[in-house]
Design a protein with these regions (language model features):
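Signature of long, low-cysteine stretches enriched in small and polar/charged residues
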Residues: 64, 71-115, 119, 223-284
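N-terminal "mature-domain start" segment
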Residues: 22-26, 41, 50, 54, ...
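Solvent-exposed alpha-helical segments and adjacent loops
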Residues: 18-35, 90-153
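N-terminal mature-domain "stem" immediately C-terminal to a signal peptide or N-terminal signal-anchor/transmembrane
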Residues: 17-67
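Sec-exported extracytoplasmic/periplasmic mature domains
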Residues: 53, 57, 134-137, 141, ...
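Secretory pathway targeting signatures of secreted, lumenal, and periplasmic proteins
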Residues: 17-18, 38, 168-228, 263
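Sec-dependent signal peptide recognition
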Residues: 1-5
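C-terminal motif of bacterial Sec signal peptides marking the signal peptidase cleavage site
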Residues: 9-12
Length: 291
């Protein structure tokens, strides 16, 4: 029996190539860029920064898509190989692009871009950047979810609304309206981070949600639920900045995403928001979530 257990252990290790690899490390949304210093300072390096550190669309303040940390290949060894996201860019005889998962650590995404000249490297980046960005973003979402699962906010109210949502335990219930609206809040050094959840009836033959309708929905709810400090003050969508509007899917359900800036009418408060309106066909409702 002992021999069988040992054989099973050996077999499982051989069948799992990630079992002996170190755990990856790094800050969220950080990419280690492996490039020669001269190449990093060339037009190819400038293009890497333009594409992978571009401004995140829809925020009032500038925030890069990823934080880039460049190192030359000569020091890419040992612990530097354990970065969760790695982008290798180098000159080689053959144009190449590939994405490898868990190459040096686990979990990890390694993106490799090669070309004979700066122009060919830039062409490779232009051709494959969407795939690379998607792979890194998915890796970061999984890492963020892993960190959240260490200490999860638990709420009977979420269960009653048939909502499975993972949030850090630092969030507390700030305000609620039974069966319809929840306001969760996490205190920070500079203020607070808020998550709003509310349900709307999904009427038959209603018009699809477009940008104007999404703004109308959030403003109508905020006027009665998200009140300001002063009398007759409440949250509205700031009109000075045109919100960004996208169509996407969450768990296979049609979703519209709106990014913009909120402000408080009759008060001096403002900030960014990210709003999702989800067509919850399972429960025949519109699920609206905003942070």
């Amino acid at each position: 029996n002992v021999i069988i257990v040992c054989l099973l252990a050996i077999t499982s290790c051989e069948n799992n190539p990630n079992s002996y690899k170190p755990i990856s490390s790094g800050n969220i949304h950080t990419v280690t860029v492996v490039m020669e210093n001269a190449l990093w300072n060339s037009e190819a390096g400038e293009h890497v920064r333009t594409v992978f550190a571009s401004e995140f669309v829809g925020l009032p303040q500038q925030e890069p898509l990823f934080s880039l940390k460049q190192i030359p290949p000569s020091i890419f060894s040992d612990f530097t190989r354990e970065s969760r996201n790695v982008l290798v860019v180098s000159k080689k005889r053959k144009d190449t692009f590939k994405i490898t998962k868990n190459k040096y650590a686990n979990p990890q995404v390694v993106v490799e871009v090669y070309g004979k000249t700066n122009k060919e490297i830039i062409d490779q980046i232009n051709l494959h950047a969407p795939k690379a960005i998607k792979a890194i973003r998915q890796n970061e979402i999984k890492e963020k979810q892993r960190r959240i699962r260490k200490s999860v906010f638990k709420s009977e109210e979420l269960k009653e609304l048939s909502i499975d949502l993972s949030l850090p335990s630092a969030y507390k219930m700030h305000k609620k309206e039974k069966g319809k609206k929840l306001w969760l809040q996490r205190e920070t050094e500079k203020g607070s981070v808020n998550v709003l959840i509310y349900l709307l009836e999904n009427r038959k033959n209603q018009t699809p949600v477009n940008k104007a309708k999404a703004i109308k929905i959030r403003d109508s709810i905020a006027k009665i639920f998200v009140l300001g400090r002063n009398e007759k003050s409440y949250m509205i969508t700031e009109k000075a900045y045109e919100p960004y509007f996208f169509e996407t899917k969450i768990k296979g359900m049609q979703t519209v995403e709106t990014r913009g800036t909120w402000e408080v009418k009759n008060d001096y408060m403002a900030g960014p928001f990210l709003n999702y309106i989800i067509q919850d066909t399972i429960n025949n409702r519109l699920l609206v979530m905003e942070g």
